[in-house]
A protein has these predicted regions:
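Chalcogenol-based redox active-site neighborhoods
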Residues: 1-180
Length: 180
């Protein structure tokens, strides 16, 4: 069964490539969502390393990482590539050399299957993004087609709305009135 809004996020530990110290120090380690209990988590899946749309999203999340951190939210990304492929891609792509959040390696497809974005025919994950609250509950899901990149500003807007814990109308923005 795939995860739905209001359900606990599956904790499926996987290997990761973590290049978080000024883009210079790299390490391989295992990461699971349980590691981030007590924090908001933005987990986004992308189809494949060494492609065209994917780096635009990864770079945009990286460029906006301070916005997420200001909201006590960690960013994680995942694809079905290995942690070594992630490292090779980051090493060879100028913009990815500045990565400040971990890249999860879902080589067994268990994480993307648990979140309902794995396509077994193509062997990759759709562009799913999940906001998970500090209690480990999935609060928001968006899944895009393979060729359509996400809007990071919209992810941040939804995170802001969820953190108000109030009713937020259509097109609500931070600073505007809520409905309660």
């Amino acid at each position: 069964m795939t995860v739905q809004v209001g359900q606990p996020a599956p904790n499926v530990p996987v290997q990761a490539y973590d290049r978080t110290k000024d883009g210079k120090d790299d390490q391989f380690r295992q990461i699971g969502l349980e590691d981030y209990k007590g924090k908001w988590v933005c987990l986004f899946f992308y189809p494949r390393d060494f492609t065209f749309v994917c780096p635009t999203e990864i770079v945009s999340f990286n460029d906006n990482l301070d916005e997420f951190e200001d909201r006590d939210c960690v960013v994680l990304t995942a694809s079905t590539d290995s942690e070594y492929t992630h490292k090779g891609w980051c090493d060879s792509h100028e913009d990815l050399q500045k990565m400040r959040y971990p890249m999860l390696a879902d080589t067994a497809h268990k994480l993307s299957e648990a979140f309902g974005v794995y396509d077994p025919e193509k062997g990759l994950a759709y562009r799913g993004v999940y906001l998970i609250d500090p209690n480990g509950i999935v609060r928001w899901i968006a899944v895009h087609d393979l060729g359509v990149g996400r809007n990071v500003d919209e992810v941040i807007r939804v995170l802001d709305a969820l953190q108000t814990d109030k009713l937020c109308p259509c097109n609500w923005k931070p600073g505007e009135e809520t409905l309660n």
